[in-house]
């Protein structure tokens, strides 16, 4: 079960190293509590600390609300939202009820990025 800090660090570090357009990577529990993560040095925060907390809460609630449909349409693999200034991704960690929340610059190639993140998560 992926619930120890070494696994979280491996996920964080591997995703951060995929592309220098990755801004933020964090592992969240089902309540939106940050278990591990951080942002790339030198990037500009677009949201205040309070709005970042609200965004994390929203992402967590949205992901776990989608699970109510999994018996009919299958388990979610990831969710993505694209904004003018960032792309936001959410991935489940298969061996726990934790999720990985990632933001990138908008120009990241999300097709290859998603493929690579899924490979990282599946390898842990």
Name each region found by the language model:
Residues 1-124:
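Non-catalytic interaction/Regulatory regions outside core domains
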């Amino acid at each position: 079960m992926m619930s120890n800090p070494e696994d979280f660090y491996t996920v964080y570090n591997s995703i951060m190293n995929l592309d220098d357009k990755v801004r933020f990577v964090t592992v969240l529990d089902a309540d939106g509590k940050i278990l591990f993560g951080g942002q790339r040095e030198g990037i500009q925060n677009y949201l205040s600390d309070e709005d970042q907390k609200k965004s994390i809460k929203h992402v967590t609630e949205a992901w776990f609300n989608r699970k109510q449909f999994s018996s009919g349409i299958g388990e979610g693999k990831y969710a993505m939202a694209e904004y003018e200034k960032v792309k936001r991704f959410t991935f489940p960690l298969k061996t726990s009820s934790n999720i990985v929340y990632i933001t990138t610059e908008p120009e990241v190639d999300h097709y290859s990025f998603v493929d690579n993140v899924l490979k990282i998560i599946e390898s842990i």
